[in-house]
Amino acid sequence: MARICAITGRRPVKGSIINRKGQSKKSGGIGTHVTTITKRKFRPNLQRIRVKLPNGGTKRMLVSVKALKAGLVEKA
């Protein structure tokens, strides 16, 4: 099952973790240097909930919490 919100279409986004080493210039050092860049994913907070449909029925969907808080979905 794809990690995509059925309402907003939110999906995982690529990003990275940047590790740095050294003392900052502000603290009297010669500056920080990048030692490692690791790829990672930012995943949306998806919940599998029962949603009320406009025709009166219900359906289970993967919905992001952002959509729930915004009131875009009515829980059954």
From Swiss-Prot:
A single GO BP: translation
Pfam families: Ribosomal_L28 (PF00830)
Domain of life: Bacteria
Keywords: Ribonucleoprotein, Ribosomal protein
UniProt keyword annotation of Ribosomal protein present: yes
Keyword Ribonucleoprotein assigned: yes
Chain segments annotated as transmembrane: none
S-S bonds: none
MF GO annotations: structural constituent of ribosome
InterPro entries attached to this UniProt entry: Bacterial_rp_bL28, Ribosomal_bL28, Ribosomal_bL28/bL31-like_sf, Ribosomal_bL28_bact-type, Ribosomal_bL28_sf
GO cellular component, one term: ribonucleoprotein complex
Protein name: Large ribosomal subunit protein bL28
Species: Opitutus terrae (strain DSM 11246 / JCM 15787 / PB90-1)
Source species taxonomy: Bacteria, Pseudomonadati, Verrucomicrobiota, Opitutia, Opitutales
